[in-house]
Amino acid sequence: MSVRVPEFKVLPEPADLPEPLPEPAPADLRLETVLGALSDPLRLRIVQKLLLESEQFDHTCGWFGFDRPKSSLTHHFRALREAGVTRQRQYGLERRSHVRVADLDARFPGLLDLVAAWTPDGV
């Protein structure tokens, strides 16, 4: 049985971006840490939505439209960043996120294809 893998978007990095917030280096990405971050259905949905629905290079937590408190979303975005799944940058008072596609594909080929093909259940 084969899995149909949807195409996901990799948008070019704009010029003059702020420096990213602290994150693991590509060589320090650990599969168990990445899978731990992706084990939460909301975080998995965040990554999938970034992969499949992004219209810009990065997005604020409000773009996702989740009916969750901002503090809860902040926790989930931090967990994804600290695991190395997403990169966040501070733009004034807001943080914007995108998936570290090149880094994750290099370390764990096929992982993002599985995330993109995942069917959410009740998130």
What does each model-identified segment do?
Residues E32-P69, Y91-D103:
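N-terminal helix-turn-helix DNA-binding core of bacterial DNA-binding proteins
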Residues F57-D58, H75, V115:
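Secondary-structure transition/capping residues
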Residues G62-V85:
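Canonical helix-turn-helix DNA-binding module
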Residues L11, S72-T74, H98:
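Short amphipathic alpha-helical "recognition" segments used for binding
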Residues E23, G36, S71-T74, Q88-R89:
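Helix-centric, low-specificity signal for extended rod-like, repetitive segments
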Residues S2-E32, Q48-E53, Q90, R100-V123:
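Amphipathic alpha-helical dimerization/coiled-coil segments
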Residues D40, H76, P109:
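Conserved acidic functional residues
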Residues G84-R87, L93:
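Short, Lys/Arg-enriched C-terminal cap helix and immediately downstream tail that follows
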